């Protein structure tokens, strides 16, 4: 039962407060809410031991329980003033805790785990990365339990929960206007880029930020704004494509949407209770991975720049995420790359991004003028033990240093926080190393500098005043019908029509469609394990049935829909090749047929690892098979079965694809980027018209893929189809033909 209290506070005239001093306290489930006429709403747990302070007609939380109003407790002060005061009060142990960012934490229930209680209490950790949550109500209750727990510790610093992107689409889920879901569903970042409309990305940010805050999330580990200049790269789908100008505009819109609170919710300028800190990543040059291999693994630790084009990779940051329009000025945090920028440091330091003074201090802090939080990517200080996914850590270039020495080097480069580190011990050791080298005063100043940056981001979003959530309200906000409708509309606008021979689409009226099953092969997971092999529909018959009659007999059908996925790529490394006497390095293929790397480099640009006795990582002459080759076979067989009747190919992608094996057999091709299949059907049936454009080039063949430069965009020979259309960046079609609008004019070179 809710209880309400009225407490009379003497009237004292004071700038920023005043009024009659009356406040209302509402008792909730495990926490209280304080409403005051001339100040922000306060939330606190009656079990945490903190009290309320009354000063000049205003109410404050006595977070350190010392009976007086400290500057950091005074919401009338700026975040900068408050962060400076609190950072000066904290012990080195407490600051070391702020420098930690937890390992991935799932939230299956509302109670804290023993591990969570331990790192919150003993290690003073306050930045928690959550992954899966049961539902919005459970997430809100977990948040409240976590906030009540830390509120009673030390200086009462609230938890700052974060998340990787969590608004992807479930392809089989049906969209019903007026119906809600677990969370609003949007196309992938690459799909957002395919709209070529930053306003859609801004709208996504404003909606996702509300959902994040309702889940207790105040920091987004996004956007990923690397320009994907290497077409084989595993993480291509998480980017806004290969173009630096488009990526910059999308990055700006994304950060503005997430960080800007509407005036009603603003606390400090545009910062407020609907703001979510954007941690833009990855500074910088990550999209140039040699051979497409990824630096999560030792075999992909190098990014290379044969086109001498490293500095273009800064543009989405310096011209986008660091130049916002919404009032928060800049993305509040940055995550550097894992990769070694091969031979790019003028002083010769081939080390991972967070270990590089060139990358952080010189390029980010000095050249770009960024003074916000810098947080390492996850597990860079851990040891690495193998060349494949089992290795563990990512200490690229500093494998010979101890864990504590790695922490010290990272701090020396200007980094503030360690992703995936729950243990304050190595940070304390690094402090001791700094004291030994530079003295206690310098070490204390360096730690306070990071504490100041980290705390500003917590003050700006109002967590010190009220970190608590109403679980029922959270359930109402997350995935509400309006948010779902906006996400679905973005999905419709993200699907590219590549081919429409003889105006095959749209197909209107009562027709019969042949819908063949797809082979889902058993494939190795990125982190190990094998998927199950089976046959099923990529687009379910029940999704198609509202639009057409479905048949399994091609002879009866008026047309066919063949839904497939892009070629399943290898990671560019194989233990089987090592066992067979090779160096382990294999091609990454973008085609369905077996691929032999005839045109690969004789000598790799980069190389060397403590676990290898050689430098050259070339895979020239080696052959790889594509696990889902049957997708190509399915298209070709369907063409044969259908004779001259239309065959529509629906291709889900997350990176460029060689289409020479598919396009000649299709009358129409739709390219999707992780959308609901219902959206595909609404386009095929003509309920909506396609409007998206390709955010990347589609290569003619694998030779042009091998011969392009990893660091340069728009440098491949593109595929030209049977109708004479070339699948270049910004190509797309609507019912009238090839699109030539202001978006194409703005972004094509």
Please place each PLM-identified region on the residue numbering:
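Glycoside hydrolase catalytic-domain context in secreted enzymes
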Residues: 16-749
């Amino acid at each position: 039962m809710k209880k309400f209290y009225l407490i009379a506070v003497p009237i004292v005239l004071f700038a920023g407060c005043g009024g009659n001093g009356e406040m209302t306290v509402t008792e909730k489930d495990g926490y209280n809410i304080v409403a005051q006429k001339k100040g922000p709403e306060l939330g606190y747990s009656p079990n945490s031991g903190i009290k309320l302070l009354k000063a000049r007609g205003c109410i404050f939380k006595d977070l350190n329980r010392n009976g007086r109003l400290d500057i950091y407790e005074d919401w009338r002060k700026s975040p900068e003033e408050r962060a400076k005061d609190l950072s000066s009060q904290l012990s080195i142990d407490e600051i070391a805790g702020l420098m930690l960012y937890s390992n991935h934490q799932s939230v299956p229930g509302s109670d804290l785990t023993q591990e969570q209680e331990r790192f919150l209490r003993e290690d003073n950790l306050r930045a928690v990365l959550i992954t899966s949550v049961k539902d919005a109500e459970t997430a809100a209750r977990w948040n409240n339990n976590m906030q009540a727990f830390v509120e009673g510790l030390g200086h009462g610093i609230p938890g700052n929960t974060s998340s990787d992107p969590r608004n992807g689409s479930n392809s089989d889920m049906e969209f019903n206007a007026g119906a809600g879901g677990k969370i609003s569903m949007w196309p992938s970042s690459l799909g957002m880029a395919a709209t070529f409309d930053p306003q859609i990305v801004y709208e996504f940010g404003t909606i996702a930020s509300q959902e994040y805050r309702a889940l207790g999330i105040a920091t987004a580990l996004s956007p990923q704004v690397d320009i994907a200049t290497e077409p084989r790269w595993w993480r291509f789908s998480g980017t806004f494509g290969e173009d630096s100008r488009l990526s910059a505009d999308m990055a700006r819109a994304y950060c503005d949407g997430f960080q800007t609170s509407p005036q009603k919710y603003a606390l400090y300028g545009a910062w407020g209770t609907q703001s979510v800190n954007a941690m833009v990543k990855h500074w910088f040059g990550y999209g140039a991975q040699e051979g497409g291999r990824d630096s999560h693994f030792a075999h992909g630790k190098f990014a290379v720049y044969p086109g001498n084009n490293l500095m273009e990779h800064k543009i989405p940051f310096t011209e986008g995420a660091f130049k916002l329009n919404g009032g928060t000025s800049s993305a509040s945090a940055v995550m550097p790359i894992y990769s070694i920028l091969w031979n790019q440091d003028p002083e010769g330091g081939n080390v991972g991004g967070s270990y590089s003074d060139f990358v952080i201090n010189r390029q980010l802090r000095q050249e770009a003028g960024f003074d916000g939080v810098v947080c390492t990517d996850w597990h860079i200080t851990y040891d690495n033990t193998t060349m494949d996914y089992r290795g563990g850590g990512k200490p690229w270039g500093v494998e010979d240093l101890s864990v504590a020495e790695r922490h010290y080097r990272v701090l020396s480069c200007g980094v503030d926080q360690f992703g995936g580190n729950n243990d304050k011990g190595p940070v304390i050791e690094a402090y001791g190393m700094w004291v030994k080298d530079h003295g206690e005063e310098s070490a204390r100043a360096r730690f306070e500098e990071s504490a100041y940056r980290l705390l500003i981001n917590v003050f700006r979003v109002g967590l010190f005043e009220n970190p608590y959530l109403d679980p029922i309200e959270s359930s109402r906000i997350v995935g509400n019908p309006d948010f779902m409708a906006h996400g679905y509309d973005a999905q419709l606008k993200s699907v590219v029509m590549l081919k429409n021979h003889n105006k095959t689409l749209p197909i209107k009226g009562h027709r019969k469609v042949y819908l063949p099953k797809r082979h889902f092969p058993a494939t190795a997971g990125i982190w190990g394990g094998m998927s199950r092999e089976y046959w099923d529909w990529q687009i379910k018959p029940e999704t198609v049935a509202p639009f057409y009659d479905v048949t399994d007999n091609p002879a009866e059908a008026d047309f066919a829909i063949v839904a497939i996925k892009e070629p399943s790529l290898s990671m560019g490394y194989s233990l089987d090749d090592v066992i067979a006497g090779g160096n382990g390095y294999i091609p990454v293929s973008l085609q369905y047929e077996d691929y032999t790397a005839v045109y690969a480099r004789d000598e790799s640009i980069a190389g060397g690892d403590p676990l290898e006795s050689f430098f050259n990582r070339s895979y020239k002459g080696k052959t790889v098979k594509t696990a889902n080759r049957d997708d190509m076979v399915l298209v070709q067989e369907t063409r044969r079965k259908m004779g001259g009747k239309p065959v529509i190919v629906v291709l889900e992608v997350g990176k460029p694809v060689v289409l020479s094996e598919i396009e000649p057999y299709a009358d129409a091709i739709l390219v999707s980027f992780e959308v609901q299949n219902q959206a595909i059907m609404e386009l095929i049936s003509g309920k909506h018209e396609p409007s998206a454009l390709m955010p990347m080039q589609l290569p003619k063949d694998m030779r042009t893929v091998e011969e392009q430069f990893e660091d340069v965009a728009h440098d491949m020979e593109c595929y030209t189809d049977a109708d004479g259309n070339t699948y270049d960046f910004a190509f797309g079609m609507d019912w009238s033909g090839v699109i030539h609008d202001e978006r194409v004019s703005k972004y094509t070179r």
